Amino acid sequence: MSLRGPMKHSHLRQVSAASLETLSTTRSLALSQTDGQSDKPSTPDERTIRLSSTGLDRRQCSLWVHDETFSKEEILFNQAAFTDMGVEVGDVIEILPARYPGDGTHSAKTDFGSRSLRDSHVESSSTLHSDSMSKFKTPLQSRCLFVVKPLPQDIKTRNPKLELSVTTSIANIFGFKNRTTVHISIVDRAQCAASHVDISFRDQYMVRSDMWRLVMSELAERIVYKGQKIVFTGSIKATVKNIFIRGKKVLSGFFSPQTIPVFRSESAKYVLFIQMSREMWDFDSEGTGDILFSRVINGFLPELFKRWVNSDARHLVTIVLFTRVEYDASAIASSTFSSENLTSMFGPNHVPTRDFYRVVVNDMASGHWTTILDELKKDFRTFLRDVSILNVHNADTPTFNATGASKSQPATIAGRPSTALRGNILEAIHLASSHLAFDHIDRDMVHTGTSIIVITPGSGVFEVSYESLASTTEALTNRGIAIDLVCLSPMPLHSVPLFKYREPAHRPTTAAFGDIQHGGYSPEMRHSFASISSKTPHLSPKSALLDSFTGMSSKSQWSGRSNEWNYGIPHWLDISYWNPETYRESRRILKKDPNAPIPFTVTKQSKVFVPRVRMYEIQMMGVMESEQSNISIPYLSEGPNISRATSSTLGSSPGSLVPPKATFRRNSPFRHQLSDSLRPEPFLHNMASSKDAMLTIPKKTPKTVLSWMDNYDENVFQPFRKRRHRRKPSKIKRPSEPEVKASNAHERISARSISRLRENESTRSASRQIDIPLPAPKSPVSTKSASPKKPALKSSSKTKLPRISRTISFALRGLSSTPPRAQASTEVNVEHARGLPTSNSRKLSGVLADNRSVDSLSASDSASTVIDLAPSPETPQKPIKNTAITPSRPISIKVPPKQPLQDTEQQGRPAIPESVSTTTTEIALGDDTRLTAQPRRHGPKFEVNLSSGSRNGSSKSPQSKALAPWVRSVNPCNTPREVLRDTSWFGRWQHAYPRPPHVAVVKWKSLKSPAVLPLTTEEFPTPSELASDYLQTPYRVFPNEDSEGIEAPKTRGVLLREMISLRLSHGFQIVVGKNVVEASAQYTLQSPNVFDTHALERAGATVFLSKGNSIHRLICVEGAEIEVTRYTHRTSSLLASDQKRKFTLYSPAMRTILSPEYVVKDIKLDSTYEEYNWNYADNYVAGHRDYLFNPAQQLHFWRVRYVLIPMRLHFKSRRLHGFNEDNEEEIHLLGINQLTHIWQRHKYIPPEEKRFESSNKKRDQNPLNIMYQTRNPSEVIAAELDRIILVDPGLDSSPAQLLPESELLERSGISLSSLAQIIQGEKGVRMMDRRWHWRLHYNCFIGFELTTWLLQNFRDIDSREEAVEFGNELMKHGLFQHVEKRHNFRDGNYFYQISSEYRVSRPESRGSWFPQIRPDKSVPSTPVGEASKGSPISGHTRSDSTEDTQSQTPSTPSKLKNKASITLSKTMKYDVDPRKRSNRPEVIDLHYDRLHNPENCFHIELSWMNTTPKLIEDTVLSWASTAEKFGLKLVQVPIAEACAIDKTQPFRKPYCVQLKAPPPKGPIPLQCNSESFSQPVTLDHQYFHKALLRKFDFVLDFEARSSYPADVEVSYSWGMPDYQYPQYIHRSGSVLAQITGEGDFLLLANRLVSTRSAASRDMPRHERLDRPDQYRARAGTYDPVDRISPRLSPMARPVHEVHSPLSPQGHASIDSANLYRAPEHILTGFADFCNDPARLEQFYSEAQVRATSTKVGPAPTTLTDASIPSLELPASVVSHHISPPPGLPSRSSHNIAAPLSEIRRSRDDSNMSRGSPRSGSLRPLSLT
């Protein structure tokens, strides 16, 4: 089976090991790459000998094997022992085992090194398969290479006899034994340089800029080994998997500047689409007889999962079943369900359709593959039933019930799945890739890469709409991903994958889009692969101009080409064919079955090929006569330079054109195209005519071939020169005209084109010009069959002219309105658009190219080329001899200056704009008796380009140029093999292929570990295209030497490296190769060392980077500046501007995991991405940052959000032994305080400030001022709005100095009384009345404030530890005491009061450090209300707050005249690399809460621009380890609220739970302030909803935006709060919950919670032990590896320990323990409770009784007043550190989903009635 059509750039793209390939195929591929270097290709063994013999003679030496205790160097080489070899430091030396007869130490069974020296054909097959390394058979593959380094002197002294020593790991790789004899020799670096190196990694997120830095740091200019471990920055780990040299796998190689690294992720996200088309239920007639779905469920998927398990891959899997259902239009019309509501898209048969998507699993760990297969089987049973039932609930909002009939109207069984050919594959792919537009938000720090696999029962051919193809192509190109297609049907006989599409039938009404200069579809995507079946007399010139570039919205239709099929092969789709029999054989081979087929051999075909198409003409031919028969096979246009006849040109008379003189390179695509597409290839070499020489070119030397072709062309084209001025139409017959006539009854011919020919690397096609007169059309000439024995083309027929035809056809075309007509030859058609008025003359440019009036030229029956009617505005209409010629241009056909009078209106404008040709030929046209579209007075003269193919020729319109590189038009029936192997077929992924892939096998390597987009590419436009089709935007960047707050790049080299890194992380690729050399005229770019920034930063050095249609050029100019030039394709800018107001609205029916029915969703499919402001980004990197007010959003920072969730503590745990005197709440606050100390310790300080601080090392960092309060932020803001103090909240700590230097105190020289006076004085500590859980503490201060004061004001206190020690001494002497007399003095949020004997009477609560507004003493004070100097509450807008705040009209009167502004969080620069392991500053923005209720979540958000993600992840892991010691769980959660998940992830949707019994009105809240009796009563309508969430252990995450007072402007440092509903999170972190305005619950699984834990759980033990010490579990802490990890999907159906025994504390519920629960179990328990009216009513009554009973007063307690505040503390404060007395019942719940006891709920709910902060109330609780 030949190679398929373009095996495009799937990032899953690598051919698997050659276990299924033949040895001959592998060898032929290797030879094909070296043919151009030698006339006689050498064999691999000859190359090896030649390679090994380079340098000096071999030397024999003794090899030692050492371990790391001896030396950490991999290879030790004693250079002094080989002085005669002339070895120098830096030389590359190869090691080969020495072989001796009878040497048992080198037996093939034990020593791989000796075995590798044996030839593969000498080895026995048993030895070949007995070792997994047996495929490295030759010395080239198995040799060991190393770079000479100086030998350490100490080792040389201790071991003088050491010659060569390798580590144990290298010895194991190469099979070396200790003290064995080896041969060494010097080799040239170029000979051993690797072409590709596969590098795999897992359990980490790596951006491509880190890959680039890793290669520069660890691999460049070094030797790499298979299996080599790579560690970068101490945390990024990778492994070398494969090394390729000239297409062969080797064990070691030199990583040269031209080596291409291919990074593969073993922890990626996979989206598997299974197309449930009609064929999925068909039986396999040739195999087992099972339906095709069984191939998926029993064959392909189990094989894929097994390979994942064997490779230890840890992917996340999403599986979606999708199909398109076609409905009977009459049945739909007769029903109550209108077709408009059903669908807005009609299929090719013009029947209503609906697309269905069923999400089976979502982000499930690949290790749960048995569960995945079970779910697939369950859904398959009901899938067909569910999509076939049309259930009408409402005509406006249709839903499709999965269970059956509706109550209101009966369900209708209608429709059936479409075939795979007409499926919705493009929509599914676009849908899956849409979430990548938000890839920088909620970044998963464990998985890298997204792979999309589409499994289809078809054969790889799809009918699609042009709009879908263009939109999907644009989206995938911008987002840098590719798709893998796995087909279950046999491979067809043509190129695949193939997309069939029709011409768009609409056009925009604007002139800009009608103009060819600004519009028009890609010619590459419009070439016809079907006969032109319409017999319309003509295509009007006006309609020819009306081209549409998106077809999204238009009312004007133009001449319909909808009956024409066009064929294209996309670059972004790779294809495989699953054959169960093949892999059954491979399994037998792996199991060493004696009856298994022998690998590396060609298995004889057991079945004969049965033709699927019978053609009468072919059957009537003799086999040997077919080359001389009268059937001519025209070529299908397949490139951008091809014009095609429209439907108006059917039935032109036959004619042919002779190809012009051209030079054919050996690997030229012409070589394989000179044959009939229906003829078997082996037959082609049996010809005896002159053409036989052309087909046997490989047997000749290139020089002989070129000489022969030149002579041949001279003879062929000689007669045309004599007739170039002939104008009289005549019936001149083509050469061999009598022999080439065919019957009109069966005119079936196969079309194939060679227009889409790539430029060859070394040889250009020669050219010449031929003028061809165009005679006036005449009536058709009937043709007759003649003797097929005469050749189709003779030199003796040079006096005859070819004729012109308009009709092309091929055997695989679909049905058309007219049967195809056979022609004796391929013909050229000319369509004159003369009817256009002068005013429209400008729009006529490109009309010929648009109309495709010329399809191909045929030199003979089996050779043809194409005439391209290409637009060229800069080339006026004039004789060809005056036409400027530019290299690499497509074929163009020009109209001569002589025109009839009627055509004079065309004289003033270019007839064929944008056409510049290198190889041009003017060809005279013979009789065309059917050109009757418009009368022709004189035949125009044509300029025909026979170029070998600039696929980016300028003949394309701007829109086509934007899409052309990504979808190429080909002749699927016979695409040349060289063209398919051309790297350009692979687009952006061309460098991911060490050797050409095959379509016949499944690419297991790519499916197991998808490749990341390569760092380099060769895709680049031509110089003229770059000048004419791209908009240039230049600007310059220079480092900011005066930047504040962060270290700016100091040199141009550092700045350049950061700018390149930023672009690589955003999907750009560094451009190399000949194309960029031609455009820039810098030959250093042919193969630049992209891994050496020192070479890139030299003055004048240029770097090109590209992404899709955007190109950036970076030039190092004089000084320290870098000049940036952005090239933006004109079409891209047009598309971007147009897409802002236009998008595709897609309305599929989707059923998510827990959804009971299919729901129609309106999804905006936007193919464009938001324009990135690179000027801002580059200047931001350079240190110019003052002009950005919100860089995180403006520059698309990577953003993640974490929350600290307070957990229930078990005080018998070893880790809590040190907190015996602390209650749960205090331990949680200690944890947050400990984190703030870490943040302050690692706060990023620029080097200048650090040097300044080093001189003043006395003072420690102060803790961040986080205001702790026991009510929610909205309650605090509402209650204390009139007490807001207008101070600057930007002060994170106390003033730097309170007392002057001369007045600083000393511990030894101060008395308690004087110290008490100072502390309570104006320069002392803040004394105020503070409320905590409804208990008011008068005249108290906080522990960390006194600690800071002591540190600042005592000369002999240098640390906070000393301050705490001194504070405890003061406390022992009676200066102050804890308000509850429970604690010593601590540096934290502890309340202390001055003892009565030292207390100074104060008339009012005050803050001693800052001036304040006199408070209303009738109102009890709060920590926020009166301690507001450090509060984040401000009366003016902060400079760092978001400026785009939407002002709202206050709904309640405000006592402040101006609208108050409150910032609830702060930000700081944090250094994630304190140990300086990276070569650049690694800084992130850390956002943290300034107001915090210990009962709620504490919010942390991280954002960064160019920081290493692995370092960030390590930092977060260290935070999590610290927090867990204090009962806090650090969990990653989405930034957006749960109800907005479907905006970014289309396959997810919140699960709605409704209360079966409506709750009663909530109790009247109480609030203790002066306004309690004056304000109106505000009921909390969500009181019972919040109580129910607390019952199921949910804690408050964020409040709704509407919860805050309307006259207060609330903001966060990261933006404005925009939550529509309040959001809660389960204590496990696995489920999010929201309460809607209607009183329903929205629940959503948090898929971000468990990625790291799952990876850690699955981590092999040796990897777990290798973790850094700071991330290991310590004594008294909890190791997440040993705990039950969170499940990755609510659909995982894990077996959970639901019925686990009671804990020692007596808690029966899982929720009480710190164990993760599967989200579905939490949801199920919650939904069951909400669906039980009896249990709900009981809950309402109990909650209401508790609420009303606590209104009288505090709940009675038996504890002393010293142990509990006067009002009441929540259970978390008083209960969990006290073990229950013996005999008391354990606090358990009957319901597993109700984790807490009724006793605790009673205490909590009693606080709710008073507006307790534990109530979760989001409204001000007050009596108003």
Swiss-Prot record:
Gene3D superfamilies hit by this protein: Winged helix-like DNA-binding domain superfamily/Winged helix DNA-binding domain
User: Where do Low complexity bias regions lie?
Assistant: 646-659, 779-799, 854-864, 947-961, 1809-1824
- For the region Disordered, give the residue spans: 28-48, 644-682, 719-964, 1406-1460, 1797-1824
Which residues lie in Basic and acidic residues bias regions? 734-762, 1798-1807
Q: Where is the composition biased (Basic residues)?
A: 720-733
For the biological process aspect of GO, one term held by this record is: negative regulation of TORC1 signaling
Presence of the UniProt keyword Membrane in the record: yes
Cite a single GO MF annotation.
Answer: GTPase activator activity
The UniProt entry, under Pfam families, shows: DEP (PF00610), DEPDC5_CTD (PF19418), IML1 (PF12257), IML1_N_fung (PF24438)
Membrane: present as a keyword of the record? Answer: yes
Q: Give the location in the cell.
A: Vacuole membrane
Query: InterPro entries, alphabetically?
Result: DEP_dom, DEPDC5_CTD, IML1, IML1_N, WH-like_DNA-bd_sf, WH_DNA-bd_sf
Please indicate which superkingdom the organism of origin belongs to. Eukaryota
List where Polar residues composition bias occurs: 28-41, 815-828, 1444-1460
Q: Which family does it belong to?
A: Belongs to the IML1 family.
Q: Which protein are we looking at?
A: Vacuolar membrane-associated protein iml1
Organism of origin is Aspergillus oryzae (strain ATCC 42149 / RIB 40)
Query: In the record, what lineage is assigned to the organism producing the protein?
Result: Eukaryota, Fungi, Dikarya, Ascomycota, Pezizomycotina
Point out the gene that encodes the protein. iml1
